[in-house]
């Protein structure tokens, strides 16, 4: 009897220690810790779920600015049952980040249960894809737009390998995207690469990676990004004009209406930083691309300004607004993320 009591107490102690360890690691872990029961295969199982929302940072920056934080938080809010994975080149096994005031955005995102930070190892990522030979030969130090070009390449490889949805880090999610294989239209005959989604190993993305290498010219802005998606879509499909708000379908790829992600086109990007008499509902949109790369003036989200962008932050990324806008008096990094177009 006494032996059984000791055994029971030992099991309880082991369980309690394990729970305490998980809680401790959750508050201090460098990568947001993997849920042990949902993804028994660890990181590989997480990635290969095929349902993840992916973000990428190809610079060495590890503390997301407010707009990036808002993009990630809003995605986690809209897709609570799906992993939100943020690939960061600046993450290393040797780097030690802790949850403290030096990294407020990293801390608040790490505390969200379905957000995970993952190191971006591009050589490993590109292995077994058409991009590997290009990556091992290219001289990144001579590339004018390397951060953006490498981001264009990485997003193709990630979604081809693992499936899921890629989003730029200046995209605020509003409602779930119901499509599996899709591209986002900026116009009737022009695709973006700021938001797209595919099932794993989709042949369209393999063809995109081949074209990326065959027609590589990083001196032309967008040649490896939206222009690549557009020219490949034209090979696969006979593009037609949109009629009304309906999406287009080509083979098993949906070409989504510009209203889905770009209700405010890039020439009018400043409207996000203006006060509207009547705020738009964006009922036809799945997410909003804020065109942060166009923001050369360094416009910021200002607390109490009642601008459209402030209202979007308050509604769709309230933690980011509270910690990084209210807590920092509206200061926003003037440097766009490498996942911003």
UniProtKB/Swiss-Prot annotation:
Molecular-function GO terms, alphabetical: acetylglucosaminyltransferase activity
Top class in the EC scheme: transferase
InterPro entries: A1-4-GlycosylTfrase_dom, Glycosyltransf_32, GlycoTrfase_DXD_sugar-bd_CS, Nucleotide-diphossugar_trans
Alphabetical UniProt keywords: Glycoprotein, Glycosyltransferase, Golgi apparatus, Membrane, Signal-anchor, Transferase, Transmembrane, Transmembrane helix
Lumenal membrane side: 26-341
Positions bearing carbohydrate: 100
Motif (DXD motif): 168-170
Metabolic or biological pathway: Protein modification; protein glycosylation
Effect of disrupting the coding gene: Viable with no gross defects. Gastric mucosa cells and duodenal Brunner's glands have an altered O-linked glycosylation profile with complete loss of terminal alpha-1,4-linked N-acetylglucosamine residues (alpha-GlcNAc). Animals develop spontaneous gastric adenocarcinomas, with all individuals affected by 60 weeks of age. Hyperplasia of surface mucous cells and pyloric gland cells is observed as early as 5 weeks of age, associated with increased inflammatory responses in the gastric mucosa.
GO biological process: epithelial cell proliferation; glycoprotein biosynthetic process; negative regulation of epithelial cell proliferation; protein O-linked glycosylation
Membrane topology type: Single-pass type II membrane protein
Topological region Cytoplasmic: 1-4
Described purpose of this protein according to its UniProt entry: Catalyzes the transfer of N-acetylglucosamine (GlcNAc) to core 2 branched O-glycans. Necessary for the synthesis of type III mucin which is specifically produced in the stomach, duodenum, and pancreatic duct. May protect against inflammation-associated gastric adenocarcinoma.
The protein's name: Alpha-1,4-N-acetylglucosaminyltransferase
Source organism of the structure: Mus musculus
């Amino acid at each position: 009897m006494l032996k059984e009591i000791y055994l029971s107490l030992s099991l309880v102690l082991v369980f309690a220690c394990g729970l305490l360890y998980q809680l401790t690691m959750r508050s201090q872990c460098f990568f947001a810790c993997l849920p042990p029961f949902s993804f028994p295969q660890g990181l590989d199982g997480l990635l290969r779920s095929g349902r993840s929302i992916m973000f990428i940072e190809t610079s060495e920056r590890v503390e997301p600015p407010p707009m990036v934080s808002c993009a990630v938080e809003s995605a986690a809010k809209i897709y609570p049952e799906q992993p939100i994975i943020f690939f960061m080149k600046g993450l290393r096994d040797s780097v030690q980040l802790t949850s403290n005031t030096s990294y407020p955005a990293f801390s608040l995102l790490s505390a969200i249960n379905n957000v995970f930070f993952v190191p971006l190892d591009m050589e490993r990522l590109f292995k077994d894809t058409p991009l590997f030979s290009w990556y091992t030969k290219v001289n990144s130090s001579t590339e004018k737009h390397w951060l953006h070009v490498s981001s264009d390449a990485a997003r193709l490889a990630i979604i081809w390998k693992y499936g899921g949805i890629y989003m730029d880090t200046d995209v605020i999610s509003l409602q779930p995207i119901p499509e599996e294989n899709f591209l986002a239209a900026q116009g009737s005959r022009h695709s973006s690469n700021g938001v797209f989604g595919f099932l794993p190993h989709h042949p369209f993305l393999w063809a995109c990676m081949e074209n990326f290498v065959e027609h590589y010219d990083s001196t032309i802005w967008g040649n490896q990004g939206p222009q690549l998606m557009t020219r490949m879509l034209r090979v696969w499909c006979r593009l037609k004009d949109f009629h009304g708000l309906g999406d287009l379908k080509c083979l098993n790829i949906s070409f989504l209406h510009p209203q889905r992600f770009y209700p405010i086109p890039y020439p009018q990007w400043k409207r996000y930083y203006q006060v509207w008499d009547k705020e738009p509902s964006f009922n036809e949109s799945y997410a909003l691309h804020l065109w942060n790369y166009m923001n050369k003036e360094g416009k910021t989200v200002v607390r109490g300004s009642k601008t459209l962008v402030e209202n979007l932050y308050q509604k769709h990324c309230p933690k980011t607004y509270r910690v990084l806008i209210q807590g920092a008096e509206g200061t926003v990094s003037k440097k766009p993320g490498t996942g911003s177009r």
